[in-house]
């Protein structure tokens, strides 16, 4: 992508930030834009604490006399928005402009609110595809890193931190994501329709009982109870080459009132905490639970005479028997020229 627009501002704590907007069009030199009094806001999902995916959205407020039509796109990842901390030269947030329609009044000075969602939310519009030529067993780490690479094609984020709260055994040292495997066919239905990459991530992270979040320059798979108990060990993955190493994440507790709360008619509340179990049933109809064992189209008489049969008399009853062979793939225990009542037991 090409840098199309940029702007700089300072937070209420005097921290310098830079907003960069990238488009697929080659616009030549980047153009500086003017931001409003509320230049950039980020909002995180807060409806539930225990949630497999916690996503965020941002609003960049621009003051302009132009229409800036190239900032509105119908593509899922057509326009990228990046927020950088100039003081530490680090990535603060990045995502993509939401595909939507453009509407603006013709007035002398206009404020445009550019809405963006983070890279995890963009996965809702990307279908899962096999990692190789065909479906195969893949580790959780392979699948998750492959999906996150689709979420970030520009490679803004290279790191994935996974807390070591789950283990196969008490003495295991390897990250559980490298030890758990699943077949890729599980992500396709009976009609071969793939799940979205977002649903794939949800199913894997939910199975682990953890939460995936995009925070600054990395992705994190965390467990709130593990953090609350003071554990800081985790595995760091490189999303692009799947290399991993053990590391420690610094964790500190802060009082909300010490951080400071400033708002207008705002409130602080503690949401209810509960356990929730969701059971999903496949409602696709099954046409035939027990299909026919023998396919008539696959059978042919073993004799040149199609009317040949064998007789067997038991008491006063005469039984007629005929034997057939498969055109395709039936295998016998031993090869015989002709099956009859005397050798049938040793052939099948």
What spans do the regions from the language model cover?
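Juxtamembrane "anchor/assembly" segments of surface/extracellular structural proteins
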Residues: 1-76, 107, 112-149, 247, ...
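Short, solvent-exposed secondary-structure boundary motifs
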Residues: 41, 86-88, 197-205, 323-330
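Residues that flank catalytic or metal-binding motifs in active/ligand-binding sites
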Residues: 56, 93, 110-112, 208, ...
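Polar, enzyme-active/binding microenvironments
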Residues: 87, 295-348
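Charged- and aromatic-enriched interaction segments used to assemble
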Residues: 106-254
